[in-house]
Amino acid sequence: LQSQSTKLAITSRAFYTEPFATFLEKLSNISGFESVLTMNTGAEAVETSIKAARRWGYFSKGIPEDNAEIIVANGNFHGRTTTIVSFSSDSSYKDGFGPFTPGFKTADYCGSCNCESIENCLSIESFEKKINKNTCAILVEPIQGEAGIRVPTEGWLTKLRELCDAKNILLILDEIQSGLGRTGKLFAFQHENIMPDGLILGKALGGALLPISAFLSSKEVMDHFKPGSHGSTFGGNPLASKVASKAIDLLFEDKLIENSKNMGEYFLSKLRQIDSKIVKEVRGKGLWIGVELNESEVNAKDLCLMLLNEGLLCKETHKTVIRFAPPLMISKKDLDWAIDKITKVFKTI
């Protein structure tokens, strides 16, 4: 950050800069995608994915102009722009912001269908029923964060991949929260060994220093963007690119992905051992864990404030879930300290 800021921080993306080129090559190599479009915020990257999917639908699939549809999942959170809140299922994100953008349908996320195995998952059936000749993409989170760390049944992404292949539609995964080591893999979709058609990244991509986001896809999808059809003043600027490149390096140099897996398994097991009447379920992957509470016993926000008084930061969602997302470099000693604080607070209720 300091080194690059003394050389060149911002310039038009019309000009070649070494930090930007290096970052694009690095991100392409680790992800397996041919093309990368950089933006600033996660919401911008989601908007970019929507534009890309629609163009692919019109120019590759032959969907009539202005008729493309994208299927999303209930409980989704993809950002706060007017287009994105248009397909939110949470009234607190959209009340008072209409009229809303058309072109989206909502299906059931796996987790809301309460299936015990992928063979009887009603979510896949729900998505299939929403597909028609104008469907260009399915856009989902591999794990839903704002919904309370909802982890789908194993095999769900594989089934979605098969459905998209069969129906000739794009599978776009929003890994703004789950990507870059958070779940114990570089990307959450790697838990099922599939490859999406599009990937959305943000948050950790900036190394907790600067905003930078990206939409990644194939040349077939990206080449539908022509000069003037998309752009960003600050997207991919040399300073953010340099920081993001270093953030990627540190993921591997410091073995943060392996640490996320190992410490996440330890943290999850310890949380599940807490004997408390207020805990309904503990779920998660890697260092991304949700503790769902019995609603009749306590409010999640109250518990978060109690934990804050103990020196531990966490975030509630929907009144019933506490989310834990510790740094990927966290140690067992730090987690033991946290578990002691969590146990203490839980047992006071």
Regions found by a protein language model. Give the residues of each.
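Conserved N-terminal phosphate-binding loop of PLP-dependent enzymes in the Aspartate aminotransferase
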Residues: 1-349
